[in-house]
């Protein structure tokens, strides 16, 4: 990409799986921010005990004292700052070239349907700015919630900017801890919504029964068989039938939710893994066929893109669409969300609204994020 002297932006993201902090250095082609290049990226693993605490908090499994939560907010902020500093050091770029950091933080609770609604991400942005020396933009979701929106998903605006449909109806599928779809028709408004559990349940079940943090290449799931009764019980959750806009998280779709659906059935662990994988494929395909049946291309990003068994099941359920990695269009699937938060920071500093009311249900376009100066 040209314009090598244009400023860089650094995006930081840790999703519902809390499997690591993704950091991405991004350069935009011009001030429209409609073309971008990944200059460098890295993923920094969470310290195991800290990750355990974050996962437990994220699924609503425990409460925490205010003092402990304040310290956790600081710890997460320091971890994000360390990830940014590691990427800067590894990439060799000069700090002065980076105009801003966009930090998503770590979601510990997402309750868009509560009264009043709220969403909560921790990771003290003041500490990120202090320990990197770079202006930091954070707290992207709460303004959309304040405007009556779900506060999620936020990536559809970025997907539209980078992967606009052109001459076909297409979708962008992020397979993180939770799955979410962006529907980009040739004509008409973009829509986006969460589809339900993805890696979060698969990883948790694999950790419980294999002692490994994820199912490498989907091998554990491939060794089992889908249990039709369990799949039906899981899909019977009323959330799946809700129309968009909708969003969810570990608070709703956690491992105890799946175990409860099993009842007294004595199932092989591999069969459960196969069924959880099929749940992800089915929930995505059902939503896509219901809401944009003319989709011809599904561009996949997030950790799930490395699960060939999951991609094969998606392709089988979507015979009319090409299912492929976003890498085909020059956007690294491992860092697409981190790149998206770099983009959100750039959009705020440019004074442009970055939510899509057609996606989140907000009352209108809003500037997203708060600025923490260096």
Curated annotation (Swiss-Prot):
Enzyme class: transferase
EC number: 2.7.1.170
Reactions mediated catalytically: 1,6-anhydro-N-acetyl-beta-muramate + ATP + H2O = N-acetyl-D-muramate 6-phosphate + ADP + H(+)
Pfam family, one: AnmK
Origin: domain of life: Bacteria
Family per record: Belongs to the anhydro-N-acetylmuramic acid kinase family.
Stated name of the protein: Anhydro-N-acetylmuramic acid kinase
